[in-house]
Amino acid sequence: GIPNFKLEKFVVERRTKLLAESGIKFVQNFEVGKDATLNELKAKHDAILIATGVYKPREIEITGNELGNIFPAMDFLTASNRKGLGDKVELFDNGTLNTEGKKVIVIGGGDTAMDCVRTSIRQNAKSVKCLYRRDKENMPGSAREVVNAEEEGVEFVWLSSPKEFLG
């Protein structure tokens, strides 16, 4: 889900190739507990790195969160990245996850929220606002990311939290 403007894919591919050439084995689509137990892995290896990322969205428990124009951040970022790699992405192509020409609001103050607002700017959204429940000084995301987003045209609305989605 990391946007290309933060980490270009060729850098990841180059680094992955170098690591593989140095003897590191990458095992993808592996399910601990199904493909092997954690104890089996511990017995077989000196060290184990589990880097799963956070792909389960936090639901906002307010009225209207089931409306058709509210999406989890990772769905949006993944679709945008895949499209950037040249993949066919139906939800992007049909306009569902493409923010071009749209008024966008992102709720949150972490780095994922900053990725969403900055990606929306790059997709030529009509406007982009970021709502965050605390003030700027207490945002969990990178201060540099906030400055970059502001310079790119994102409007921040501090001390704000939605009470209800209307449509």
Please name every model-derived segment.
Residues 10-59, 71, 75, 81-94, ...:
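A Rossmann-like FAD-binding core segment of flavoenzymes
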Residues 1-6:
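Short glycine-enriched, charge-decorated loop/helix-capping segments at active-site entrances
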Residues 111-120:
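Short glycine/serine/threonine-rich phosphate/pyrophosphate-binding segments
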Residues 33, 109-112:
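Short, glycine/acidic-rich beta->alpha junctions
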Residues 97-110:
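Beta1/beta-strand and adjacent pyrophosphate-binding region of the FAD-binding site
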